[in-house]
Design a protein with these regions (language model features):
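Auxiliary tRNA-acceptor-end handling modules of aminoacyl-tRNA synthetases
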Residues: 1-16
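Charged, compositionally biased N-terminal leader segments and the immediate start
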Residues: 1-3, 154, 172
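Polyanion/phosphate-binding surface patch
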Residues: 42-72
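Acidic, His- and aromatic-enriched active-site or binding-groove loops in soluble protein domains
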Residues: 60-66, 172-195
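Short, conserved phosphate-binding/catalytic loop or strand-edge motifs used
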Residues: 118-122, 157-165
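Short glycine/threonine-rich loop-to-helix capping motif typified by GTGT followed
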Residues: 166-173, 246-252
């Protein structure tokens, strides 16, 4: 008897009915915000993933070589492939672009609750706007999806740019070093001891995290702009960085009642 590969699953007819209902609901919400669907190849050149995806994702990529000796990778996420499409195919389109996707992605991770090696990913990319209203739009869109599906949920909101600013002020100016510290903060690691071992004073960073006030202008703007029905769902967490190298500003994660892992998330990346 053959078994399915570890970290994958079969969808039986009753599962597919439920899945299609979820997908239909997500599509309806995305399109109500004027987002258009996009689909990219299941595999990309590995160089694209290596350059555009974060270190955490790069470590979990399925990599293989084709018969021509080219190194390829199964897509581990959709941000890098869509960035490629925008640069090559949509460069001349009027901005901002509003794109969405619902597709499968692949990561070689240790299977556990909420973690699969093949899983389905629904998301949006809003490209070409630096306005905070764009961040609010994407967060509100996620809230509306969860609300429409009937989940009890909340949103964690952070600001990676504020952490990077403080790190620069205390002397940590190297981007790779900042990314390492952001990853430690996101995982709950002992970033203070690490900074001290490198000769940096962590007190300013500790003060940023210990304050109970909403002390970044961007977060204040988001809370002011969000509709009343969504703003009470937001919890500010300045330690949130999502563990990905490419975020440069606001970041967020969605949580639903009964699950201790995020069911979604994202953030601003301007590079």
């Amino acid at each position: 008897m053959f078994r399915r590969p570890k970290g994958t699953r079969d969808f039986l007819p009753e599962d597919m009915k439920f899945r299609r209902h979820i997908e239909k609901t997500i599509r309806k919400v995305f399109e109500s915000y004027s987002y258009e669907e996009i689909l990219t190849p299941t595999f990309e050149y590995f160089d694209l993933i290596a350059e555009k995806s974060g270190e955490e994702i790069r470590r979990s990529v399925y990599v293989f070589e084709d018969k021509g000796g080219r190194t390829l990778a199964l897509r581990p996420e959709m941000t890098a492939p869509i960035a490629r499409v925008i640069a090559n195919e949509l460069r001349s389109r009027p901005k901002p672009l509003r794109l969405y996707y619902i597709t499968n992605v692949f990561r070689y991770e240790e299977p556990q609750r909420g973690r699969w090696r093949e899983f389905w990913h629904a998301g949006v990319e809003l490209v070409g706007s630096s306005r905070v209203e764009s961040d609010v739009e994407v967060i509100s869109l996620g809230c509306e999806v969860l609300e429409t599906l009937g989940f009890k949920y909340y949103v964690k909101l952070g600001d990676v740019s504020e952490i990077r600013n403080v790190l620069s002020e205390i002397g940590v100016t190297d981007e790779k070093e900042q990314n390492l510290i952001l990853s430690m903060i996101d995982r709950g690691g002992d970033y203070s001891s690490y900074l001290e071992s490198k000769g940096f004073d962590p007190r300013a960073l500790n003060e940023l995290f210990s304050t109970r006030e909403v002390n970044t202008e961007k977060i204040r703007q988001v809370l002011n702009l969000m509709e009343d029905k969504f703003s009470d769902r937001v919890i500010v967490d300045l330690k949130l960085s999502r563990g990905l190298d490419y975020y440069t500003g606001l970041v967020f994660e969605f949580y639903v009642e009964g699950l201790d892992v995020a069911v979604g998330g994202g953030g601003r990346y301007d590079k």
